[in-house]
Amino acid sequence: MDKAERDYWHLRSLEIEEEPRFPPTNVADPLTARNLFQLYVNTFIGANLAESCVFPLDVAKTRMQVDGEQAKKTGKAMPTFRATLTNMIRVEGFKSLYAGFSAMVTRNFIFNSLRVVLYDVFRRPFLYQNERNEEVLKIYMALGCSFTAGCIAQALANPFDIVKVRMQTEGRRRQLGYDVRVNSMVQAFVDIYRRGGLPSMWKGVGPSCMRACLMTTGDVGSYDISKRTFKRLLDLEEGLPLRFVSSMCAGLTASVLSTPADVIKSRMMNQPVDESGKNLYYKNSLDCVRKLVREEGVLTLYKGLMPTWFRLGPFSVLFWLSVEQLRQWEGQSGF
């Protein structure tokens, strides 16, 4: 051992801990086209399995957010989650709870699958081993990668979000005596394009992308961070308990982060337009926030938080357990 090594021996472990090695040598599943395709299919299957169980909660949440406008005009009390569900079943029938499900399935093929695949691609360069041979991903890197992945995926899936919201609110419009606006997913696309052209397909893309960024950060990024944290602090091994706890944390985080943007997105997408395709109620997202806070109060931005959590909590658990189980059956390591 030379003099330099003797003088600075106490700093060697710190240097190994902080200095990442590229490319990571401990990633069990290499980044190949096959693995990316498997992940894409797995997330699509997992998303639809989870969505089939919790979709009625999403419909009720959207109804609550949109009905706030009607309550504001008539002076009536804001509808509760329970009252919304009960009224939908009593007046429109059980099938109203799955209004827009076809658009959601199509959206899952683009949004849910793509955001997870993009996150996996984006995070790979930032994974490294520490001195204990543990795979490490900095928290801010995970959050940044998930934020970016959510934005890109939602920008592509936005037209399906517009159709989904319109299909979910159609029953309420008919109940109030308005003309029929949506009969099917294809007809909804045609009608939106006919009224506003291609730009109308991306109406509300700003708040929609912001919500997707926050939700993906809370869902995908938080799930990844939670798994690594619980492994280290609680000494949990890869398996059902670790996946369940991590997905619960992810669902709660996603709900808290995404609800305000979700309210704005629903109001922007559901508002009518004039013959030239111009919005009639809100000029843009900031105008929507300003009017909501001034006319309905700050808490309106969290209207539907509980049904959002009731939906995203179970969705996150079912989604991640399904994806992880499919990966396990395919002989891959945990996400």
Curated annotation (Swiss-Prot):
Q: What happens when the gene is disrupted?
A: RNAi-mediated knockdown is adult lethal at low temperatures. At 15 degrees Celsius there is a severe reduction in the number of larvae and flies do not survive to the adult stage. Second instar larvae moved from 23 to 14 degrees Celsius show no heat production in response to the decrease in temperature. In second instar larvae body wall preparations, maximal oxygen consumption rate (i.e.
Organism placement in taxonomy: Eukaryota, Metazoa, Ecdysozoa, Arthropoda, Hexapoda
Instruction: Give me the Solcar repeat coordinates as residue ranges.
Output: 34-125, 137-229, 238-329
TM regions (residue ranges):
40-57, 100-118, 138-157, 204-223, 244-264, 304-323
Which family does the record assign? Belongs to the mitochondrial carrier (TC 2.A.29) family.
Q: Which domain of life is it from?
A: Eukaryota
Molecular functions (GO terms): transmembrane transporter activity
Q: Name one GO cellular component term.
A: mitochondrial inner membrane
Recorded hits in InterPro entries, A to Z, give:
Mit_carrier, Mito_Metabolite_Transporter, Mitochondrial_sb/sol_carrier, Mt_carrier_dom_sf
Tell me if Membrane is a UniProt keyword of this record: yes
- The name this protein carries in UniProt is Mitochondrial uncoupling protein 4C
Query: What is known about what this protein does?
Result: Mitochondrial protein that is likely to be responsible for thermogenic respiration. Likely to function in mitochondrial uncoupling i.e. creating mitochondrial proton leaks across the inner mitochondrial membrane and can therefore dissipate the mitochondrial proton gradient and convert the energy of substrate oxidation into heat instead of ATP. Involved in cold tolerance, it is required for development to the adult stage at low temperatures.
The membrane topology noted for this protein in its Swiss-Prot or TrEMBL record is: Multi-pass membrane protein
Q: Which PROSITE patterns match?
A: SOLCAR
In the record, biological process GO terms are: response to cold
Q: Which UniProt keywords apply?
A: Membrane, Mitochondrion, Mitochondrion inner membrane, Repeat, Transmembrane, Transmembrane helix, Transport
